[in-house]
């Protein structure tokens, strides 16, 4: 019984951490980067509460940079 409780507690803590981490990624600003590639990406715009398309240059980005609209919406719950 004690072991089951401990496993449940660890799982809950892990999911909470992942949710908090994803939430902080979604609050990061859009970063185009200094490079000159042309990648169509999506970021979560915290002001509008929506995932929006932008052009990523290919380097020095951050976590708020998703290859698909679906991925952006799944992580940021938009």
Swiss-Prot record:
Compartments in which it is found: Secreted; Nematocyst
UniProt site positions, description: Has role in the stabilization of the complex by binding to different residues of TRPV1 subunit D: 73
Keyword vocabulary terms for this entry: Disulfide bond, Ion channel impairing toxin, Nematocyst, Neurotoxin, Protease inhibitor, Secreted, Serine protease inhibitor, Signal, Toxin
GO cellular component annotations of the record: extracellular region; extracellular space; nematocyst
Gene Ontology biological process: venom-mediated suppression of sensory perception of pain in another organism
Pfam families: Kunitz_BPTI
Site (Reactive bond for trypsin): 36-37
Site (May bind to TRPV1 subunit D): 53
Record-annotated disulphide pairs: 26-76, 35-59, 51-72
Domain BPTI/Kunitz inhibitor stretches: 26-76
Signal peptide coordinates: 1-22
SUPFAM superfamilies recorded: BPTI-like
InterPro entries assigned to the protein according to its UniProt record, in alphabetical order: Kunitz_BPTI, Kunitz_BPTI_sf, Prtase_inh_Kunz-CS, TFPI/VKTCI-like
Site residues by UniProt (Important for modulatory effect on TRPV1): 70
Site entry: May bind to TRPV1 subunit B: 23, 28, 60
GO MF, one annotated term: serine-type endopeptidase inhibitor activity
Primary role: This protease inhibitor shows two different activities, it inhibits both the capsaicin receptor TRPV1 and serine proteases. It partially (max 50%) and reversibly inhibits capsaicin-induced response of TRPV1 (IC(50)=54 nM), a receptor of the pain pathway. The second activity is a weak inhibition of trypsin and chymotrypsin activity (Ki=1 uM and Ki=5 uM, respectively). In vivo, it shows antinociceptive and analgesic activities. It significantly prolongs tail-flick latency and reduces capsaicin-induced acute pain.
Miscellaneous section: A synonymy between H.magnifica and R.crispa is controversial.
Family note: Belongs to the venom Kunitz-type family. Sea anemone type 2 potassium channel toxin subfamily.
Protein name, per record: TauPI-stichotoxin-Hcr2b
UniProt source species: Radianthus crispa
